[in-house]
Each structure stands twice: as structure tokens, then as C-alpha cells.
């Protein structure tokens, strides 16, 4: 058991283990966004840091087909930050929240030796809430968008290069419209944050899968993609593909859910610890 799994095992509860927790009519989700873990200050503008912190948090709610409404913000900042840097960071957070209809209703601030942003998103559950591990035997497995672009951008930055402000690493794409249209016929969903090689086993739970698509190493390993990983019945294949076309969302079917084991390439996948 790796350290992340060990930590999580101490806090098992019927409501956790998914992208968010469904409690009554609301879904609660949280992600941390930490300097030198998820980003370096020289890679993103302060406004870009604030914006991405919000986007990666909204991704969990969208994967569960919930509508984000409110946020609680925890903000720890180094004392050496200038006022204009603080203003830019807050502007990125606020403008991105406003764009997605989210109001910040509380939180806390403190000092730290690096930037730490913690958001708790409170979302309205829609008619059908989607969870991990609910795919049925025979269901197709697919992901939205293109995987590998976030890792490509990260490698460029690590080598001292520059990437476009709208690159996947800086600005993840949230598949809101696709989810709104397709949720009613999906059986399971989650967002891809730790790379497909890490997230597919979490998505399937105790089920296996036959992977028919030929994917590159970067597609398997690229984290912080925030694309959707979804499952749906073969009888709904044409409808899901139709919704993808209507919303201009690339959709790649990679295999089907099966009894037995999941066989994926043995790459060294990302670990938090």
C-alpha cells in the first residue's frame, strides 16, 4: 500500500471514496493546489495560479454531474508576496469562480513558506449523480479530449521553455456541456487528475477491462488533464458519440469493462508520496 492509500484508509466512510461526497441534495468536494507540488511560481502568472486552482476543483463536481454553487477558500501565502501579486492571485480566483457561477462564502488565511490554495466546492446535485466504480460488465470505457498534453507542457517548463497561456497545463478544459447532455445515459464517471494509468483502476474498482485502444506512454501517464473518464452501455454508444459531436468534444473509446483483471502497461505512474 502506498502512502496516499494508507492515509485515505484511515478515513474510510460511506460518503467518501469518490470525486466528491453526495450529502442530501449537495455534492461536497475538495482539492489542494500547492506551490512546488502542482506548479512553480515562475511557470504561471499569479492570476493564472488562482484560475487553475479553481478549475481543478470544479472538475470534481462536473465529473459527478453536479452544478458548483459555493466555495470555501483556504489561502496560505508567503509573507514576501507583494500587494499586486496578492491582488492578481485573488483576481484569478474570483474571475474564474464568477465565470462558473460560484460564490466564495467563507474560508481562512494564514502565512506559509509557499502558496497553498485549498478550496471546498459545494455543488447542487442534479437529477442523476455519477460515481466511480458503477460501470457494468460490457460497458464501453472512454475519455474526453486528448490525453498527454498536460505532461508535454510540464516537460517543456521543466526544461526551461515556455508554453502558451491557453495550454492544457495552464488552463484545463472542463467538459461541462458534454456532461450536461450525456449524464443521463452514462453509468460511471470521474475526472483524470493523476493520469489514466492511476485513475483507470480507481474508476473500475474490482472490475477488469479489455483495453483495445493503442495509447502512448504520455497518454497513460499524463496527470492534471482533468478530462472525463466515462462508461456507458453499448446500446447508448451512438447517443454518447452524438452528444460529443454536438458539444465539439473529442471522445475516445479505449475498451470495455470485463470480469477479471485490468492489464495496462507497467509504466512508473505518478504518486503523491
Named regions from a protein language model:
Residues 1-273:
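Helix-biased detector of long, well-ordered alpha-helical tracts
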